[in-house]
Amino acid sequence: MAAISQKIGNLIGGVSQQPDTNKFNGQLRSCDNFYPDTALGLTKRPGLRGISKLANAVADGTWFPIFRDDQEKYIIQFSKAGALKIWSANSGLQQTVNAVAAESITYATHKSADELQTLQINDYIFVLNRTKTVEAGTAAAAAQTPFGFVTINTVAYSSNYTITLDNATSFSYATPVTTAPPQAQLNVNDIVGNLVSSINANANYYAAGIGNTIYISRINGANFALSAVGGNAGTSITAFKGSVTSAAQLPKSFFKDWKIKVEGTTDSGTDDYWVKFITSDNTSAGAGFWEETIAPGVIQDLNATTMPHVIIREANGTFTYRQLDLASATGSAGPSTVTGIVTAVAISSATSGGHVVGEQFAANGGTGNNLRLQVDRVTNSVSSVSSAANSSSYIRQDRTLIGYTTAGRTTSPAYRYTYVWIFNGQQIGVNSNGAPLTIGNTVYQQNGAYQTIGNELRAGITATTTINGVISAISIVQAGQGYTATNTVSNSAGDTFTITTVNAAPLEGDASRLNFWKYREIGDATTNPMPSFVGYPVDLISFYKNRIVFTSRQNVICSQAGDYFNFFASTVITIVDSDPVDISASTLKPIRLKHAISTPQGLLLFGDNAQMLLSTTTEAFSPKTAEVNLLSTLSQTDRIAPVDIGSSYIFVEEGVKASSIYEMAVTDINTKPQSTELTRPLPSYIPSAIVDMQVSQSAGTLAILSKQETRNLYLYRWFQLGDNRVSGWFRWIMPSDVEFFTFDHDILFVVTKHGSNYVLSRMSLLTDTPAESLLFEGQYLDVRLDLFDYNPTRVYNSGTDLTRICFKDGFEDTNLQPVLMFLNADVAGYFEEQTLQYDAAAAVGQKYFLTVDGNQTTSKFAIGYKYEASAQLPAFYFVKDDRGGKDTLNIPRVSRIKVNSYNSGPYRAVIRAEGRDDFVLELPQVNADNYLANNIPIIRNAQSTIPVMAKGNQFEFELIADSPFQTAFTSIDWEGTYNNKGIQSL
């Protein structure tokens, strides 16, 4: 049998449920709590950094992220009963929500999370309830008493001018018969005046003259009939009852605010419009002009209680949740005086390292809230401590006789020298040459000649500690409010800052407080109808081409361009490009378009059995050019919003027991989208009952949460280079049930439930914390703990001579293993797994704790919970060629496996072979012959050998990393024997 050696080039292929014989190199049977990375390999996922308990969060709530910018990030929750709560995502502090009207609470009442949707457009946060049927309002344009008017167009002598009302009563005036003297000049005012006087003499009618026009109505306001004849031509006198057939027939002088309909074609009312008279001098009657208006008595508004509501951030930092009606807008608060706005901050004490210019952080403490600071300059802090040979800190030279050497007739003893480093009475390292010793950011070096102290040979040492990245200048990026001068605030690393000056300022509230769902101001129910969503629920709220977009059933409705709150036309005389769009999608099956993604081709709309594209084939998007075209008829679960991963879109199709995840690429509106099932190699891996799916494009990571496994996030990561993609599926097991998660760029925010507490945490997917964390060979590495805290509260008890290292309020969880990590440079990397302790009498935030000996209130610690990462490899087969073909007939016998790692801490390898006990090999990641006390147990590049001695398909091989340190597996080499019995494969 031939000895062979083969390499598995990486382990980032993710989980595959295909038979091991069909798996590609790099694919795994299982992968939990690892994060595949093309640069680093299979890395242990970052830990969750605990932010805060979310005060007053409720069970079974519906959560949404509101990320306005880097400074203002919020997490909101609606209870099923409609109550709203808001917290800062940066600090976890609950924000003030002003009193909410009962109708707004009712609007947000819901039974399942998918019934609610939010949409953030700059300063607006819209809230949609998909179950609420939109209704027309009750505000109607003012009714108008039936009236008519008669216009005297020409005057003539010897003529009769007759007005007949209700086909029965006539009023006439006869002009003089001649123009010979002494007859006066004929004037239209005489005709108008005499006819008005004649009509007003009848108790049933009222008339008024203005210019050459006579206004007529019934005294009791009832309707009536009107006609007029006279003059010496057919058009000498004309009568109109409430409407005209041409704008040319409108009088040049009339009474202010009276309305007349201008009729279009006789067989349709769709081209009619209404006009209102405006006097030039704003008096009650006179010359003026006509402008387009709303018909009398027409309902103008939408019922705001049934329309989407809005969350508004007020000037004083509070939030208002309300309906968008006229009364609320006009009654909203105007400018308000905000006090305690921070204008200057000074550094009080900055000792932590690892900070970088541009780093931003929330300032904790003080009387106010929402203060954020930025690092503008950093410096390096260097401190040295020297000690003499006869002190408790020294280097000791030991020698051991190892033999003799002979030179000529001289024989001399040969010694091996070792150098033992002692600091404050504790051995911290051993080396063979006495060269300076580096532990963390401290360098220990000999500072004098060796001398005999007792029976030892010693020299003094100097310990030089260099802390890089100490904050030396800061600026304010978010001033906050409610602070007072002399307030002390801090960052999470324990650096402190003093607020030196504050001021007060009158600030306007958010502009959205002045907006409301606009009224219909033009036309009538036929010419300017209610939007097609009236009478039905709104299924989706989105944004496209500077318009708010609603969908309702198969209809797509867009607001006016630039006027997000207006769904009525600005004129009915012509079609204006900025007017609303209201079109219907043509489908064979009923459809509800519940999700949308903006694409270069248009607005991609998703229904449960079809995908549509709202677009235009011209440059301008308008009522005349807008189209909704069918792209595909792929089936999907419409409870879960599809996501945009940059070059394509991902959506979910749920089965009874498992879910399928599809990717769809849209190239143009004339080409059918290409669809690929991403879960084809693992058909039963993703559970059904999906509740949320989110994506981080910057980290190339998709995450899915299911009701069936509430502690687990299923993730898909991809790396795209041109047309080539490396991708894989894997699972993250969270410390407790996940209530909510979302991405903000490469930051994952997670809310987990621990007992009755809801805890907000964050995870940085691409970079480790640039301060506070462990320093390894000049690189900061975060601890691999969940709910970890780099600056826990420390309380010393002199009676027990113990220091309590406390978990934050709400972070206690007896189902998890607490870990205490020491961060001081001389002991960095030392950690203890302890039992969680409880003191009911302690202050809030100090009730749950771990302990260390002595008074260590000035020492640095990290505290958190242990989590385990594990990956199981498939069976080992001989790979015959570069294409990955496996010889599944002739199974090799594996002698040993060599695991290559990078920047990795301790881990263990487990071999489960048929017919023998499990073999577990602990790999501590400590270099031989180089002892550094309490040094971080991480090796930059390492290869560990695990003995196997089993056939490639008769054992399981699993890698487990449960230490609080980073672990990254780059590749696998295996050695063994292989015999193909002389048969050559074709």
Residue ranges and their predicted role:
Residues 283-288, 292-510:
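Conserved, function-critical positions that sit in or immediately flank catalytic
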Residues 56-71, 109-121, 530-545, 585-600, ...:
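Structural signature of eukaryotic scaffold interfaces centered on beta-propeller domains
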Residues 58-68, 73-75, 82-84, 94, ...:
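Threonine/glycine-rich low-complexity segments that form extended coil/beta-edge repetitive scaffolds
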Residues 92-96, 285-288, 509-510, 577-578, ...:
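Beta-strand initiation motifs
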Residues 618-657:
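Catalytic or ion-translocation cores adjacent to nucleophile or general acid/base/metal-coordination motifs
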Residues 80-85, 131-133, 213-214, 547, ...:
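Loop/turn residues immediately N-terminal
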Residues 1-94, 264-266, 270, 320-328, ...:
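N-terminal beta-propeller domains
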Residues 2-61, 65-73, 657-986:
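Beta-sheet repeat architectures centered on beta-propellers
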